Amino acid sequence: MYVAMIIRKYFLIIALLVMPWLAIPSVSAADKGWFNTFTDNVAETWRQPEHYDLYVPAITWHARFAYDKEKTDRYNERPWGVGFGQSRWDDKGNWHGLYMMAFKDSFNKWEPIGGYGWEKTWRPLEDDNFRLGLGFTAGVTARDNWNYIPIPVLLPLASIGYGPATFQMTYIPGSYNNGNVYFAWMRFQF
């Protein structure tokens, strides 16, 4: 019940952030800057998804060089949870996705996150089902220890995938005893 309430609350916030982008008219490629390209990609992913995705958080790892041992001994590094999204591949073969996910954070409290992700995709083998990706995600999260105040995030993404299954990951930078967390999940396309 509590998790559903948090997800609904943040879905509404993200929807309010995304909806204005959907109203932006398309302009010619010559007139586009990075922001218009970004908003057009978000809008197209919202309006014309090719796939629906299931996200399953797999691991969080706190960089041992950046934490006191007594802290890492107490932290949760098994972020069970679930997420859903929609995605598409563009004409260059790059991945675009919109997602919402909720998982157990380092303190074993629920953390919702939602946003847009993009990855430049390489297919280095003859088998086009195998792929590697590098990109970013821009979104909003909220944490119990910050009173669930919405926090914008801009993080790197990397992935390795085969067919409909992708192992996707990010690194949350930080200072000593804060941040410096590797977070990874499985993404299944339907």
Swiss-Prot record:
Residue(s) at site: Role in the phospholipid gating: Y176
Q: Which example biological process does GO assign this protein?
A: lipid A biosynthetic process
Q: Which InterPro entries match?
A: LipidA_acyl_PagP, OMP/PagP_b-brl
* GO MF annotation terms: acyltransferase activity
Signal peptide residues are 1-29
Which is a Pfam family this sequence falls into? PagP
Predominant location: membrane
The EC number(s) this enzyme carries: 2.3.1.251
Family indicated by similarity: Belongs to the lipid A palmitoyltransferase family.
Q: What does this protein do?
A: Transfers a fatty acid residue from the sn-1 position of a phospholipid to the N-linked hydroxyfatty acid chain on the proximal unit of lipid A or its precursors.
- The molecule here is called Lipid A acyltransferase PagP
- Which species is this record about? Salmonella paratyphi A (strain ATCC 9150 / SARB42)
